[in-house]
């Protein structure tokens, strides 16, 4: 193309659709060597390169673990829908192809075997191949046993314990019907699957042939049948021929206790093996040599046998037996003989603990109690699953701890999320690394948007603001972040019926009110204690205490405590005489009051002569407290008879005021004075009355008192006045 042609193109009217070649050549540099190579390439070769580029994406999708998981979930859903649905065989073939085509990115096998070659080629036959009608033919327990035994065969091949098609590992399926699982004779250990195992009875007759057309080596099964018949506790038997085991079986010293693995086997049994067990006497002899408790049997010049109550226990004993034999063979080769070896004492040797402790700082709960060999076997099953064997083993305890999310309190996810694909044409399929990265981003975005469980709806533009506003509306049926946990305080692994019965029993006790304070003392059971009430003690009369018989001897007191309870007869007699003397003095004081009323001016009203009592001293020198009108007495610090003088108008232990005396009746002291006919001379003749420090200012008639109508504001209120009997004694002393 020259310059004239380009000018003609410019001047000509533009076409409606520009040609594709012209846009392409405008973008391509003709002098680029890469462009020249592609232009000179043959069309078929160019098409092949384009197909390879397209297949790269397909292969990447097929090799992604996410696609495998989704495919397996689809297969499981198809199994649930029917036995032979349309397209199930195609999905199964795709799943097998995906399992076999996974690249070898996992760690290598422990030692080797045929399985190592298969893994290097990316061709691993899955252990759990029970699908379709095969899985329906067996119950759940037999499925698990088939998967365990087939995985055991794979482990034996990986550890190098296999010897072509020989050796056998068997397990008991049903103790009632005496059915056993064994490998078909002619199948390598690396080819054994769950469906290929053969079910036989105790005589070696085939009950279920499995998925193969191979038979059973009945001569090899006779050893297993003899042990199963003698040991009902045996659930799994392993018989292998390893070089180290055959070497130890040929030694006269047998297995020496020179390693912890040798001591972990317990009592080791030996049997002189003379070939295949064809007669009954040989079976009886091997049963006698094994005994009822031995877990390990060494066949002289032949091989090793282990017996276990489970598949895991049988693997544990055979593994330790093989390791102990290898240690002994290598030790004898370097030491020169058994005499140069140091033997361990089984009684003093402390075996390692099999129950791991709870990790520090974790409160999620203790791990399960492992049986013998379960923890080791489960770890090896995880290894096989990581290698792509698909063992189908039911794990008891997860190896990886699920990290608790930081924002687990936000239960309700966001109504809207900001995550989107890179482009509209992106289908969502990506590489595993990108898928993991996007999953983390989605988790973070989900939490950021999950602050509210409401629905966000945007309102359109209005006249006030050109921007859209977000309006939150409450979602119906929204769950709260905290929900009640059922049976929160019920212990785990308990019978719920027992918990309900205990709850009903507690409720019945509460309704019938039959709960007690607990067991009574047997020492003080029959002792009756008489309690005497002391002065000032608070006596309770609670109805609940009386009815519940917590306090059998209850004294119900309707009045106050007796103030004369602690006084002697002599003190009571002196108190009686003192009261009589005071009453006599009150009568004389009343006469003096009448005389003063006559001499007083007529405009002043009469005020009752009830002066407060002041402390006096008896002949014993004891102070006398003021008395109350009603005869009650307040206790003193010393055992002095209480003063029940009728002069005081208050019941409390306090001096009355003038205002209180003003409201008192002038005749209040008269009945008390007339009640005592005895003369005032009945008091003790030797009693001396000492005048109190009160002055003469406290006269009986105080015009400044509150009760007087002629009260003078210049006069101060007198709170304390001299008693009448003290005034009388003072007059006598003056005269």
From Swiss-Prot:
Chain intervals for the UniProt region annotation (Disordered): 1-21, 418-486, 576-735
Bridged cysteine pairs (disulfide): none
Organism per entry: Rattus norvegicus
Pfam families, sorted: Aldolase_II
Highest taxon of source: Eukaryota
Protein localization: Cytoplasm, Cytoskeleton; Cell membrane
Major localisation: cytoplasm
Protein name per UniProt: Alpha-adducin
The organism's taxonomic lineage, starting at the top: Eukaryota, Metazoa, Chordata, Craniata, Vertebrata
Annotated region (Interaction with calmodulin), positions in chain: 715-732
Chain positions found as Phosphothreonine: 331, 358, 429, 445, 480, 610, 614
GO cellular component: adherens junction; cytoplasm; cytoskeleton; dendrite; dendritic spine; F-actin capping protein complex; membrane; nucleus
Gene name of this polypeptide: Add1
GO terms, molecular function: actin filament binding; calmodulin binding; protein dimerization activity; protein heterodimerization activity; protein homodimerization activity; RNA polymerase II-specific DNA-binding transcription factor binding; spectrin binding; structural constituent of cytoskeleton
């Amino acid at each position: 193309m020259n310059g004239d042609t380009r000018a003609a193109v410019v001047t000509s009217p533009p076409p409606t659709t520009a040609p594709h070649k012209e846009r392409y050549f405008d973008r391509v540099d003709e002098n680029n060597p890469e462009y020249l190579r592609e232009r000179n390439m043959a069309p078929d070769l160019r098409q092949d390169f384009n197909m390879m580029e397209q297949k790269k994406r397909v292969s990447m999708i097929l090799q992604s673990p996410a696609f495998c998981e989704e495919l397996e979930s689809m297969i499981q859903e198809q199994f649930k829908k029917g036995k032979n649905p349309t397209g199930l065989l195609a999905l199964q073939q795709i799943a097998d192809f995906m399992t076999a085509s996974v690249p070898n990115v996992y760690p290598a096998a422990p030692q080797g075997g045929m399985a190592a070659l298969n893994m290097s080629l990316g061709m691993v036959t899955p252990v759990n191949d029970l699908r379709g009608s095969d899985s329906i033919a067996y119950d759940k327990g037999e499925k698990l046993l088939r998967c365990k035994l087939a995985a055991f065969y794979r482990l034996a091949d990986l550890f190098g314990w296999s010897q072509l098609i020989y050796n056998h590992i068997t397990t008991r399926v049903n103790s009632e019907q005496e059915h056993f699982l064994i490998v078909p004779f002619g199948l390598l250990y690396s080819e054994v699957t769950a469906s290929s195992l053969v079910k036989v009875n105790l005589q070696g007759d085939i009950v279920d042939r499995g998925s193969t057309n191979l038979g059973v080596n009945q001569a090899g099964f006779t050893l297993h049948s003899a042990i199963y018949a003698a040991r009902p506790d045996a659930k799994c038997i392993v018989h292998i021929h390893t070089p180290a085991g055959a070497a130890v079986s040929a030694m006269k010293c047998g297995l020496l206790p020179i390693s912890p693995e040798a001591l972990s086997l317990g009592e080791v049994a030996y049997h002189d093996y003379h070939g295949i067990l064809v007669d009954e006497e040989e079976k009886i002899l091997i049963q006698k040599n094994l005994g009822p408790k031995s877990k390990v049997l060494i066949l002289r010049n032949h091989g090793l046998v282990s017996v276990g109550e489970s598949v895991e226990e049988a693997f544990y004993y055979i593994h330790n037996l093989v390791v102990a034999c290898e240690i002994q063979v290598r030790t004898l080769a370097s030491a020169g003989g058994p005499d140069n070896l140091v033997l361990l004492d089984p009684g003093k040797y402390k075996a390692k603990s099999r129950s791991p402790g709870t990790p520090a700082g974790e409160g999620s709960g203790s791990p399960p109690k492992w049986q013998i060999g379960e923890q080791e076997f489960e770890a090896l099953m995880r290894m096989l699953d990581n290698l792509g064997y698909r063992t189908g083993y039911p794990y008891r305890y997860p190896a990886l701890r699920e990290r608790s999310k930081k924002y687990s309190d936000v239960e309700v996810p966001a109504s809207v999320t900001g995550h989107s694909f890179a482009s509209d044409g992106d289908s969502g399929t990506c590489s595993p690394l990108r898928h993991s990265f996007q999953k983390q981003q989605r988790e973070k975005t989900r939490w950021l948007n999950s602050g509210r469980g409401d629905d966000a709806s945007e309102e359109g533009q209005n006249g006030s603001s050109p921007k859209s506003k977000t309006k939150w509306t409450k979602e119906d049926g929204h769950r709260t972040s905290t929900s009640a946990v059922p049976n929160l305080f019920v212990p785990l692994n308990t019978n719920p019926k027992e918990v309900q019965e205990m709850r009903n029993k507690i409720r019945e006790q509460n309704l019938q009110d039959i709960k007690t304070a607990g067991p009574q003392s047997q020492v003080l059971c029959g002792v009756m204690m008489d309690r005497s009430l002391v002065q000032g003690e608070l006596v309770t009369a609670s109805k609940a205490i009386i009815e519940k018989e917590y306090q059998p001897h209850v004294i119900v007191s309707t009045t106050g405590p007796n103030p004369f309870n602690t006084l002697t007869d002599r003190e009571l007699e002196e108190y009686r005489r003192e009261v009589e003397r005071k009453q006599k003095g009150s009568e004389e004081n009343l006469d003096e009051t009448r005389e003063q009323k006559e001499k007083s001016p007529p405009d002043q009203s009469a005020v009752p002569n009830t002066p407060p009592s002041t402390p006096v001293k008896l002949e014993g020198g004891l102070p006398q407290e003021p008395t109350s009108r009603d005869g009650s007495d307040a206790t003193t610090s010393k055992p002095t008879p209480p003063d029940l003088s009728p002069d005081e108008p208050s019941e409390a232990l306090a001096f009355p005021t003038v205002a209180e005396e003003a409201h008192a009746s002038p005749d209040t002291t008269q009945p008390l004075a007339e009640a005592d006919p005895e003369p005032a001379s009945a008091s003790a003749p030797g009693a001396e009355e000492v005048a109190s420090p009160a002055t003469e200012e406290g006269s009986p008639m105080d015009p400044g008192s509150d009760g007087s109508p002629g009260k003078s504001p210049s006069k101060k209120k007198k709170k304390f006045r001299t008693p009448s009997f003290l005034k009388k004694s003072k007059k006598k002393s003056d005269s």
